Amino acid sequence: MSLGGTRPLPRVLSLLAAVAALTVACGGGGVRIAFRPQPGTRYEYVVTVHSTVKTQLGDQPAQNDDEETVLRATHTVLRSQRAGLVRVRVQLRTPGGTTRTFVVDLDRAAQLDAIETIEGLPAQVFGNLGVSEIFPAAAGAPPTRVLHAGDTWRIDDHLRLPDQGPARFVGAGRLVELAVVRGRAVARVRSATRLPVARRTELRQGQVVLRGSQATESTTTQDVSDGAVEDASSLSHGVFDVSLLPPPGSKAPPVDGRMVLDVRSTVRRVG
């Protein structure tokens, strides 16, 4: 590699440092890539979500909705792993300036424990967001043990989700490769997960009950030094039974139906 005028010296030194870090990390034949940030650390992302929803209720014709949303996400680390949990505040902003805030908790093993909404408008304003869009590092979080390229692991997390309560997040992950991207030593992880959905939403006209499951395949590139996500992409497919329940006191019968949801998303670090 030439160190001539074709590339600024600081960039070359940064690249060499990343290669050295990757070499040290893999010196024993493996690497640890658990999410372990310092309190106060902030990460900025652009999140693009494209969703297609097909809904059929009662004897009505099926309705199709197609939507693409671009969000700006700010992740701020509130509590370090040394205190027991890693707690991260996730703020998602629409182009119009609307903000929804989540708090994400990870346990001592850096596995997802809970995602909670603490403020902001209802979920409908932000489209069909899932774990991969809110906090991509948790979509197939590796174990804290030393991993080698090609290693696999099981995902089996009991967690709390917004508007739902307890759920079991299951699947499998795989460390695809180790590389250097934009001067950072990174690990690429692929995962396939399934999340059950059992949600009841109160409306003025009654209640909406949603039951089913959502399967997601994702690829995540994480910084080896602290586990932060550099970029991610995911494909989700969900099939749900839908029930529209009348308000208390009404003699109207419930309306049952079915909803099929497909979501494609990308997450890119910009700061």
What is each of the regions a protein language model found here?
Residues 33-34, 142-145:
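Short, surface-exposed secondary-structure edge patches
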